[in-house]
Structures are given as C-alpha cells and as structure tokens.
Amino acid sequence: VAGPFRIPPLRREFQ
C-alpha cells in the first residue's frame, strides 16, 4: 500500500 492510487505507476510521486 504505497498510496491511494497504487494502480498507476506513480510510485515516483510519493518517493
């Protein structure tokens, strides 16, 4: 659970 929208590859945004 990296965020509320872990479906799209936006992991760089919460990094």
Swiss-Prot record:
This is Antifungal protein 1 large subunit. It comes from Malva parviflora (Little mallow). One of its GO terms (biological process) is defense response to fungus. Antimicrobial activity is not affected by salt concentration. Keywords: Antibiotic, Antimicrobial, Fungicide. It comes from the Eukaryota. Possesses antifungal activity against P.infestans but not F.graminearum. Heterodimer of a large and a small subunit. The lineage of its organism: Eukaryota, Viridiplantae, Streptophyta, Embryophyta, Tracheophyta. The keyword Lyase does not apply.
